[in-house]
């Protein structure tokens, strides 16, 4: 189909949608589009998976459980399922992971950016398998949340504001290649030499560090202005 051709160069992963909500001991997975084993799946209705307390990480996975070659088409049988094995096989993708204490509720609303990686009782999206043009990607929801928090910062530099708008205006997730370029430029403090190749939780931690730096004015326009004023005073 035209849609399969449009996304033929994308790797396996979530391409759009699949937003998560937790209520009544159920994880609700919204409509979306997923590529798995080089086939595009359109999820047109909400799916639900019941969850229970777990003292170790449990992964919510999208899984192809059966593939049948018929005379004129291929039929797939798929499922969303919880698995305490975090490793993925070729027919699996991770949607999220979590640890849940007995008596606690699972949260999909976050207090702040760092909260996405809170150890217990929170849906963790940092290691979800997302797909973008150009390669694998960090969750669109994670990068959008990062962008919104950057735009709340008065000290944000123009380049951070521009990148935040780029993330928010992108209809799809942004590849790790682009994200790593931004991380490298920020980490090198203007001396762009290193090449970063981080994914998942490590990429999330880098963005968390950058956001904290922006919030504290570690590399802000305000600091640049202060340095210039001090130089003017010295010259006088």
Regions found by a protein language model. Give the residues of each.
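N-terminal "first-domain core" detector
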Residues: 1-45
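Beta-strand-rich solenoidal segments
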Residues: 35-236
């Amino acid at each position: 189909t035209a849609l399969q051709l449009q996304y033929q160069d994308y790797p396996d992963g979530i391409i759009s949608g699949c937003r998560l909500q937790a209520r009544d001991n159920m994880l609700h997975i919204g409509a979306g589009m997923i590529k798995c084993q080089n086939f595009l799946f359109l999820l047109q209705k909400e799916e639900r998976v019941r969850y229970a307390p777990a003292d170790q990480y449990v992964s919510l996975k999208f899984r192809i459980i059966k593939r049948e070659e018929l005379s004129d088409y291929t039929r797939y049988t798929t499922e969303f399922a919880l698995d305490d094995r975090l490793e993925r096989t070729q027919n699996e993708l991770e949607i999220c992971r979590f640890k849940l204490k007995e008596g606690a509720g699972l949260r999909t609303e976050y207090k702040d950016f760092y909260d996405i990686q809170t150890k217990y009782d929170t849906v963790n999206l940092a290691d979800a398998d997302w797909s973008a043009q150009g390669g694998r990607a960090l969750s669109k929801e994670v990068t959008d949340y990062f962008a919104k928090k950057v735009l709340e910062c008065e000290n944000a530099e123009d380049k951070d504001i521009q990148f935040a708008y780029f993330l928010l205006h992108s209809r799809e997730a942004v590849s790790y290649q682009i994200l790593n370029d931004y991380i490298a430029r920020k980490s090198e403090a203007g001396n762009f030499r290193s090449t970063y190749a981080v994914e998942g939780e490590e990429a999330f931690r880098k963005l968390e560090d950058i956001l904290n730096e922006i919030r504290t004015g570690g590399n802000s326009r305000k600091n640049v202005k202060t340095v210039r004023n001090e130089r003017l005073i010295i010259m006088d």
